[in-house]
């Protein structure tokens, strides 16, 4: 059979694939979807000797009659069944060890995950250094928003017009 380190890494792979895509999964049981993903990602399913249909049939054989998931023990039985089909020229033990090496230590591959793409228009519209007019007043030099002071003009009841620079200097001129 497989070595002890292979068994632990095989069990580790089982747990990683068992919880893949399911937030409530404990890693003790694997669904048919995740079993198919494991076979595809670990190259057990080569499309010639072992097809997706074979993988599904083996899953149906090893699981309990009314169950929808397989345990680790059923998982090892499924690998034994597939190993004979995948590695036809080898003995049962050699084929099982070969298929264990394919699966051991592997993790689910997330292919086709989309990332947020910043296009030219988005960059142009969200860059605060390029703002003009009254919108420019809403941000400081670093691009951080000023909050309420940037959105609203705060009224100071001093008696002077807002842009008058010499506010408060009249008394100094009159006293002389």
UniProtKB/Swiss-Prot annotation:
Annotated spans, Disordered: 132-151
Any single GO BP term: microtubule bundle formation
Gene Ontology MF term list: tubulin binding
Pfam families linked to this entry: p25-alpha
Entry superkingdom: Eukaryota
Record keywords: Cytoplasm, Cytoskeleton, Microtubule
Gene3D superfamilies the UniProt entry points to: EF-hand
Protein name according to UniProt: Tubulin polymerization-promoting protein family member 3
An annotated GO cellular component: microtubule
Organism: Xenopus laevis (African clawed frog)
Composition bias type Basic and acidic residues, residue spans: 134-151
Function statement: Regulator of microtubule dynamic that has microtubule bundling activity.
InterPro entries cross-referenced by the UniProt entry: EF-hand-dom_pair, TPP/p25
Family, per entry: Belongs to the TPPP family.
Location within or outside the cell: Cytoplasm; Cytoplasm, Cytoskeleton
